Amino acid sequence: MERYLSRRESGFHIHRSDDNSLMRRIYSSMNMFNSYHANCWPTDAGRTGAIFNLEFNADGNVVVAATERKCVLVFDAITQKEIFKVPDAHTDSVNCIKFFDERLFATGSDDFTVALWDLRNMKQKLRVLHGHSNWVKNIEYSSKDKLLVSSGFDGSIFTWDINSQTEQGLISQRVFHASGLMRCRISPTGDKLVLCTSGGYIMIIHHLDLTTLHKDLCGFRPGIYRLMQLGEQYIPQAAKYDHVFSKRQKKNRVELVTDFPENNDAEMIMALQIHPHCCCMLTRNVSCDEQSEWTCIHDINEEPVRSEDEQDEVEPQPKRKRVSTTLASRSSLNESQDQDTVGLTPRQARRPLRVSSVQVFQLDNSGAGRGASDNPSVLTRSDSFIPDIWAAEVTVQERAIRQNRARVSNNHVSGYNFVYAISSGVLPLRQLGANSLMGSSTSPRPLTTPPPTESNQSSSSSSSSSSSSSSSSSSNNSDTTVRLEIGNRLRLRSFNSPVTTPTFKENGHSILVNAKKLLYYAAETNTKPGFIKEPGFSADGRVVCSPYGNGVRLFGYSEDCCDYPKCQAFEEVKSKPRKLVELAKITEHQDVVLCAKFSPREPLLVTGCNGGEVTWYRPNL
């Protein structure tokens, strides 16, 4: 440290190695020096419930906490003292906070509303925004378009013009809908919108224009497009949106990110942050087995265009898989409308049910869905039916109805229950025998009455997220109703068994293959399953803070705490993703840590836990 300061005082050039070693010493020496409970009366400690989120203002001198029991806490970041406490900021849990400037901020809640606040007068809200039909889980602000952006578990993304008030309220618009939406983030430069979902994929919208987003992506359903990719079954209503992935899409171009570490079959991607310099994105996901959580860093930038393609002025063709299909002559399916997930009644049980079998449906030429065993003539008319991955949408709706009916029997409250999920497709499907695929019964049990086995009941009571998608396949010789026994989970996979893999004779179609984006990863503990843990970047982007049990871990990209890799180093990491390097591990809380946030101005870290404690950390040099 003395050598570094001496060189800087003398005006000598600071070597990168010296800078890295200094940053490593600063971050690895982080220690707790104050806590919210230490400044409370003993009777007040923990009354606010869990701390779900923390947010600094742009100057870094104010911290706002969102709590489980409807409360908003405002702290002075310099003295760590509580400035304001709003006990009934909402009528339900407060989930998220977003500052517009030094004094104005918004909060989102499980009461389906967004509230606007001014630090100069915390006695009342500036305005309450109504529009969502489910829990509001994320708020962003686009300084470029001057629009507030909110998203919730209803799958909807709304924009609000907070500068144009009318008698009916603020001017708002629903610009996009994605089933299973968990989080959305706008990059600091305002040119990208990133969505993470419960479907095991991340969606990046490049060259973001919120004013035309609704028109540019009207009708596009990323969940159905992902089903087509996983099942390798051509779906006309999904494939007709190939143009949104094209380089010719000058505004609101879409890219899907689906690669994850080995042994991490990502399902519920529940937290999302973007690097301060817009280099990458940080996510935290729950694997499909619900036994592990993972922190991952993916590249957020567009894939480079080859120089020969630029010179020839020819659009580069993305990598695609060739699939054969007979749908070219039978693509007259009715376009489905976007449907919100079923609304939830607050404070009721939210534990999902599990399903252990799937009936594969098929569509005839008129688009009417039915089970393959409903009509005996199916076996002799194999060419008049098409594989129906659209049955996944029916499954989603049926599952939501079942969950709605089952809420009374379970009192568990989870941060991401009632969000349907499919897995990312990283791990192979477990081996299934032909007998289990075909089933011994010709009339399978309906989806609404799963078998009440002990394993299903135990899994249903110990897990907090479930998947609800299905794929269908048919044989070249006959169409048979297939019950896919996949344990306690509905999973979508591409099957290679001759029993289920269809073969077609007509022209083939290509399906886009997503680019590899994974850079770094780390395995996490799965303590307090059902609660969302929010990681975060440091202000300089060198360090990642990730909740880990009753504490946090600080990760770096390398042992020497170097900055984000560039040029050749970046290409090496991208070709072979690496584990994040643990710089420090701090355990100071009495309960599981749910959120962590760095100050935008100094090496100051704040964490919040399930017990309601807010803890402050700084370097101890």
Curated annotation (Swiss-Prot):
WD repeats lie at residues 46-85, 89-127, 131-170, 176-215, 588-621. Keywords: Phosphoprotein, Repeat, WD repeat. Residues 324-342 have a biased composition (Polar residues). Residues 305-349, 437-483 are annotated as: Disordered. Pfam families: WD40. Belongs to the WD repeat DCAF10 family. PANTHER family: DDB1- AND CUL4-ASSOCIATED FACTOR 10. This is DDB1- and CUL4-associated factor 10 homolog. It comes from Drosophila melanogaster.
